[in-house]
Every structure is written in C-alpha cells, then in structure tokens.
Amino acid sequence: MKKMNRVLIKRPASTFVLAQPRVLALALAAAFSGIAFAQNPTTNVDKSVPTFFNGQAQIVTGFQDKTKWIKQELWVETEFDSDGDGKKDRVHVDVTRPFQTDTEGLKVAVVYESSPYFAGTMKNQKMWDVKHKLGEASPARPVNEQAKFIPVRPEISRTEIDTWLPRGFAVVHSEAPGTGLSQGCPTVGGAPEELAPKAVIDWLNGRAKGYTTLDGNVEVQATWATGKVGMTGTSYNGTIPLAAATTGVAGLEAIIPIAPNTSYYHYYRSNGLVRHPGGYLGEDIDQLYDFIYSGAPEKRDYCNATIRDGLYPAKFDRKHGDYNDFWAERDLLTKIKGVKAATLLAHGQQDWNVVPEHTIRIYDALKKQGVATQLYLHQGGHGGGTPPLEMRNRWFSHYLYGIDNGVERDARAMIVRENAERGTPPTPYLDYPNPEAANVNVYLGAGGNKAGSLSTKAAAKATTEKLIDDVQYKGGVLANAEQSPHRLLYATPELSEALHLSGTPTIKIRVAANKPAANLSVWLVTLPFDDKVVGSNGQVGVVTRGWADPQNYRSLTKPGNYDSKLPGTPLVPGKFVDLTFDLQPMDRVIPAGKRLALMIMSSDQDFTLWPKAGTELSVDLKQTNLVLPVVGGADALKKGLGN
C-alpha cells in the first residue's frame, strides 16, 4: 500500500490545519472560511493554537500543562431580579482557559456547563405521602432541611475541563440562580433559568457586565473569547442548555443536552395523572426546590415564602394533576421556536427518571423548524450514556470553529443496540423514528386475567373484561403471574422472527371505573418477563410504559404531546370513556422466541399515587387497540407472528 503524504494547508497569520490527502478538500474549504486554524503540535511553530485533524479538535501539547491554565472567578449581571431586593441578580461563574489567551493573544471558543448542583444538595430528602385517596389533597407537605451554604468556592466545578482545554477550548461553569454563590431564588424552570445562562453568553460576547466580586463594581471582560459558545450537561445540567437556547441568544452555536428534563409537567405528571419520576416516588417540584437550594441563607425566607410555599401550592395542582399555565411556563416545548443552536440530543431508553419523551418531543420539534439536530439513543438509564467523544468533538469542532467535517450530513440517529458490548459504536440510522417504520394496529382478544391474545385481527364481538386495583403488586410480578385479577394481559404468540419497533406506541382504550377517579397504567412487555433491573427503575422485560388519568378523557382524544389546559372531570361510575395517549418512545428489537404483550393496570407501585385497593376498571376490548410503530410495517409484524 502506498504511504499517504501529509499536507499542511497554510493560511495567513501563520496558522495551519493538518490534513491528509483524503481530507484535503475539507481543509481547503476550511482555509477560506474565515476561521483561524491551527498548527499541528508536531510542527516547528512557536504559538499553540487549536488544531483539527479528520474533523476533530486535537490535543495540543502547548495546552496540556494544567499548572499554566488561567482560572478566573466572577459574577455576571443578569436582566432579572428573582429575590425581590430591587437589584438585578448576579450569577457565579468560573473560567478555565489556556494561558496563551493572555500571552499570545489567542482567542478560543467556549464549552459551557451550568448547574444547580455544583454547590451541593439537600441530604435525607423527604417525599410526599403517596398513600391517599385520588382527588383529595395530599397529607401535609414534609419539612426538608435545605442544602448547606458554602460561602467561599472560587472553583465551581472541574467537569469538561480535562476534555476540552487540551483541545483548544475554554471551559466555563455557572451556578443556577439561588444556588451556590449565585444570587436569586431557585425557580425550578421558568424565565430565570433561561435568562441566567443567556447572561453568561452575553458576557462572553461583550453584551453583559461581569464583576470580580458579588457586589462590587470592578468589571472584567472576556476579551479572550471568540464569542462562539457550546453548552452541554446531563439531567438538570442538560436542561439548562436547551433553556438558554430558547432565548435565541446570539453566540450560542451548539448544545449537547444529555437526558434533559424538558418539561416539569412531563416529569411530575402524565396525561392528567400525578406520576412521579422513577426512583423518586412522592417527589414533586417543591422537593426539587429544597433539594437544590444551596444559596445565601439571608434570602431563603423570602424565596421559600414566595416560591415554594406561595407559588407552588397555588399552582402546581397536586390534587388533580392537570396541565396549566404554571406548567406551561416550565415546558421548553412551548418556547422551542427560539432555538437556533445546533442540537445533539442524547437519552437512555431505560431512563424512567427523566423518561425518553423529554428528548424525543424536542428532537421532533427542532426537525420540523429546520434546526440542525442529531439524536443518540442508548440502552441504559438516566445520565449513563454520554455520546462518544468523537460525536461531541465533531459537533463542537464544526459549530464552534467552523470545521467542515460533514457532521451536518451524518446519520441523524445513532442508536446503541441491545446487548452491544461496551465500546461498540452505535448503529447509524437515517432518522428516528426509523423511516421504514409504519404504524400497525393490534387488537385485544378475551382472556386478559390470564393471557388474552394480541393480534392484527379485530374482535368480532363486544367483550368487556375487568381488573381490580391493588397497588401492593408490582408490575413485574403481575406480568409474570399466570393469572391475576389485578391486571389484564394480552400477548402475541412467540415471535418466529425478530421484530423491530421504532417510534411511539399509542393506545386507544375504552374504559369505565366504579369510582369517580382511578389511575390508569399501561405497560408493553416481553414474555417470559425478565425482571432483572436495568437502567433507572427499568426492567429488562419492559419495552415501554404509559400512564393517564381517565378523568381527562375530554382532552385525551389523539396521540402526541399532552399540553391541554382542559381540566379533568370526575368519572361517572360504570360509564365508559374513550382515551387515546402515547406510551414512551423507544427503538427496540424484540428477539425471536419472545412474546410481545400489552398489560393494563390501575395503580403502578413505582410511579403513581397509592389509593386503597378495590377500584375496578372495565375495558371494552372491541373499542380498544394498540398502535405499534413496526419497521417494515404490517408485513413485518405478520412475518414475525408466523402468519
């Protein structure tokens, strides 16, 4: 094989990009893009500057000495006053940047992470009591001790620094309002959490003021910054990049939200139902407020009275679970039109803390409005699946430094397949859902207290089947039971071939209760059910799940994101109502030899409130069906069923 010669592409001002012949075209295009490219660390050039090879920022020797990194602490002035003192809140910021930004006039792009967690969180969290009658107020709110205040913290965090500093970026951290040394009140969503990171990005672009102290007047500027900013983070830290992006702030070029909570309604409610995040039974937005509140003690009385004990109980409606203006303000989908930043989203399919719809609803919306976006799905739980560094590097190299690496032409969806060994690259797909997927109706056949049928054949006659709610039985136990009065189960025959599902299943159900209120929980499972715990409150046998409040039947008339402000109404005992709602989105391959089953329950021990046992649900099988997104459509399903 002929040895390939390396080529140096020379630009003005003695800046270089290292290339190989096969990437020469990319390098040439980049050389005329107006971006300052870099030498390779092996070349005999005195100055260290960002270097790119095969479309990715490379580690540069001159940026590696941690003892020479410049560290700064400052406070950036925001445009809001959330703590009622009549002064604009300031947020605490730290900066780590290459020393060459001082000694050689180097300007660099920024990787930025913001969080309410950096200063620590509350210990021994106490939750709401979930054992009470549906539709009644919860027992008294538990009293929690908020996080300890730490008055001196010049270094906020070290996340992202070791990854990006040696590659020619600066790294910036900030503490969310009301946490650490940032002023203000925690609001858990809403405008302050959008405008605080916006202020930091404005400061990096010379549009906002930064100060050397919390309350002083000595200003500091970011003269070393190019103005190009990328944000990233996981969980709450992944929510904030998207929140900042909804403001449309200039300079925020790219974000990588990992397992972001994109709507506090969809975190604490589902389709009109009080539904807790997996692993945090009894948590609501007020507990999360206490959990993160690490800010100044002298402001806590005001913030607690105004927000936690004032706004929240007046608006969050833990009694009914309905969507309203309070929740809409904390739903980033309502503000998605402002997003311009290129968005690489990541989520785990076994994340039952922040469930997958949080990411998929945003991905779908951004595609529709033409924002550059890419999706990474893995098989793990909450926060456990950061996209490979190559993906993140290509994303930031392209959007922050203008490298023409073709990332915008990559496969739109990268999915880690089931049982993939650690380190196995994700499988690329043209998009998500898989473009070859089509919705297929499957129907329920009698026998659900044991195992009725699930097939493509609609019921010939009207049949009603009943279950009796009893929350003491976990869903996995009910799925494994040969017979149970506490659930209805409908299963396919054993699959003769693997079945690939890609998208969001939807259930259309006609149901009646013997009481004015009832929980409704739906699981899609594989049989025999594997109850091995996986991810965040997941089990291997769970394909996906969904929950809804039958009282909200007037607004549950079609699939898709739930954002109706129409309140629920008490059920008339014995009267059937029709509901249509989504289960959680997923991309799963069901192996041959398994049976796919729909399980209908009332209360879900790990997620819903726990009313006393005895509520009866009746399901009209003829007027109920499941819609499955099957890759290959009806033909693939029939083939998998051996038809």
Question: Where are each of the predicted segments found?
Answer:
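C-terminal, loop-rich substrate-recognition/catalytic regions characterized by aromatic stacking residues
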Residues: P41-K47, G55-V60, E73, Y376, ...
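Accessory cap/linker subdomain of secreted extracellular hydrolases
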Residues: P41-N54, V60-F63, E79-S82, K88, ...
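N-terminal cap/lid segment of alpha/beta-hydrolase-fold proteins
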Residues: I59-L106, L495-E497, R510
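Short beta-strand element of the alpha/beta-hydrolase
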Residues: G105-P116
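Conserved alpha/beta-hydrolase
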Residues: L165-L181
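Short beta-strand/loop motif that positions the catalytic acidic residue
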Residues: V339, L345-H347, D351
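Conserved alpha/beta-hydrolase "acid-adjacent" motif
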Residues: W352-H358
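Catalytic histidine neighborhood in serine/cysteine hydrolases
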Residues: L366-G383
